[in-house]
Regions:
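A beta-strand edge to alpha-helix "cap/lid" segment located at domain peripheries
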Residues: 52-113
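Short, low-complexity N-terminal intrinsically disordered segments enriched in polar/charged residues
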Residues: 1-20, 24
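Alpha-helical interaction segments
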Residues: 1, 43-45, 86
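Hydrophobic pocket/interface hotspot
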Residues: 10, 21-23, 30, 47, ...
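A solvent-exposed, acidic/Ser-Thr-rich amphipathic alpha-helical stretch
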Residues: 28-69
Length: 113
């Protein structure tokens, strides 16, 4: 599976509340960076358990919808709306790196405006 197919399946599983299956698409050594809105700070998670745990703890109703995307070979960059019950939706740039059908890195950065 290429980057587009892998990320599309990952998001489909997230949005269908099949987060455990989505986590299986993460590489064992996956890395995730999450930028804090309005700050220069970033949270970094390493390993499938920690990165996957972030998605597993998101709770029912957590959704990630792609508004626009581009495939850059092994990278997939998307403009994504993140929705979570009880919280305002966020507009982020999601940068996925895929190798051998597994997501090896994911970086989420809030988009302004």
């Amino acid at each position: 599976m290429g980057a587009t197919e892998t990320v599309d399946l990952f998001l489909e599983l997230i949005n269908d509340d099949n987060r455990e299956q989505a986590v299986n698409l993460l590489a064992e050594n996956a890395v995730m960076g999450i930028s804090v809105p309005g700050s220069d700070e970033r949270t970094n998670l390493r390993g499938r358990d920690r990165v996957g745990g972030w998605f597993l703890r998101a709770g029912d109703g957590f959704r990630m919808y792609t508004n626009d995307s581009r495939n850059m070979g092994g990278s997939y960059i998307a403009d994504v709306t993140v929705m979570r019950p009880g919280a305002p939706s966020m507009h982020v740039e999601a940068n996925f790196r895929v190798e051998g059908g597994e997501i090896v890195s994911l970086f989420l950065q809030p988009l302004s405006g």
